[in-house]
């Protein structure tokens, strides 16, 4: 739903090395749009609470990469034949400096907390460089802004954000520009979508460990288009597991049955005042990704 914040946990088959801990950094890929500023607002407030550092990352491309990127993507500059690489780089630096100045103004006015942040530029394909940086630096979370409900449905998440969500091993929090929340402490109820896969339990543990300093209730939901007794049996088993594993967490359990799964989910979100949707992005091979 357009009014909800989308949180995606990407859990893959490979195990994270136990000796490597995630850094106390929050990564914000920015494209100088209004929804980038919304992501900054949320991230800066989270960084204040978690005593974290914010990294603003912008990825630009030169004509070398132009043919590899889709038209109309919010991260792209339109490159004319008359533009030189030098001009492109100057434009990127100018835009990033303008963003930094705008953030400084918001810090001075008190709209943003005064926390440590830095700006980084990388050349390449946006989603690839975002994922590469996340793999290298291991931030605690990636926060990305998305378009609001006045935009076309296909644009709500955006191709770059969707690709990062699909492939990232780091939690990705996508913030619609029209979301009323300014910080995570305002979130009161989270929906966690499960397919009764064991990886969902791993994803939930990672999700819980990331946000356990906040207070919220969780709705564990399964989406289906037909009645299946096994769903009820599996749900009963999950109830028992979560009761033992998370005794202090308020959890609701529901099976949503609707011929139109997205319509059923949207209605559930409205009826139950869900603030964030959490889901697991399973690792798929190249053929599954294509088809």
Regions found by a protein language model. Give the residues of each.
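A short acidic, glycine-rich active-site loop
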Residues: 76-94
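Structural beta-alpha unit
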Residues: 1-4, 10-21, 61-64, 90, ...
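N-terminal membrane-insertion helices
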Residues: 89-100, 235
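Charged helix-capping and loop-helix junction motifs
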Residues: 157-160, 233-238, 290-291
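Short secondary-structure boundary segments
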Residues: 146, 222, 280-282
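Intrinsically disordered or low-complexity boundary/linker segments at protein termini
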Residues: 1-41, 112-114, 140-152, 156, ...
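Small/aliphatic-rich secondary-structure junction motif
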Residues: 8, 18-82, 188-252, 274
């Amino acid at each position: 739903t357009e009014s909800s914040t989308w949180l995606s946990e990407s859990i893959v088959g490979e195990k994270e090395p136990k000796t490597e801990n995630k850094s106390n950094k929050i990564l914000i890929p920015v494209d100088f749009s209004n929804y980038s500023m919304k992501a900054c607002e949320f991230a800066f407030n989270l960084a204040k609470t978690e005593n974290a550092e914010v990294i603003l990352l912008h990825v630009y491309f030169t004509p070398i990469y132009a043919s590899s990127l889709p038209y109309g993507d919010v991260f792209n500059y339109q490159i004319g034949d008359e533009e030189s690489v030098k001009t492109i780089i100057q434009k990127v630096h100018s835009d990033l400096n303008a963003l930094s100045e705008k953030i400084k103004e918001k810090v001075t006015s008190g709209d943003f907390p005064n926390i440590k942040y830095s700006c980084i530029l990388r050349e390449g394909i946006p989603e690839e460089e975002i994922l590469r940086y996340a793999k290298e630096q291991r931030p605690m979370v990636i926060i990305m802004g998305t378009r609001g409900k006045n935009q076309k449905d296909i644009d709500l998440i955006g191709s770059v954000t969707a690709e990062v969500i699909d492939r990232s091993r780091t939690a990705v929090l996508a913030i619609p520009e029209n979301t009323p929340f300014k910080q995570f402490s305002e979130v009161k109820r989270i929906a966690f979508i499960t397919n009764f896969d064991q990886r969902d339990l791993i994803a939930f543990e990672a999700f819980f460990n990331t946000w356990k300093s906040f207070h919220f209730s969780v709705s564990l939901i399964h989406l289906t288009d037909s009645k299946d007794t096994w769903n009820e049996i599996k749900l009963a088993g999950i109830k028992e597991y979560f009761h033992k594993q998370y005794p202090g967490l308020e959890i609701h359990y529901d099976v949503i049955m609707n011929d139109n799964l997205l319509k059923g989910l949207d209605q559930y979100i409205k009826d139950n005042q869900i603030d964030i949707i959490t889901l697991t992005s399973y690792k798929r091979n190249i053929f599954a990704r294509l088809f």
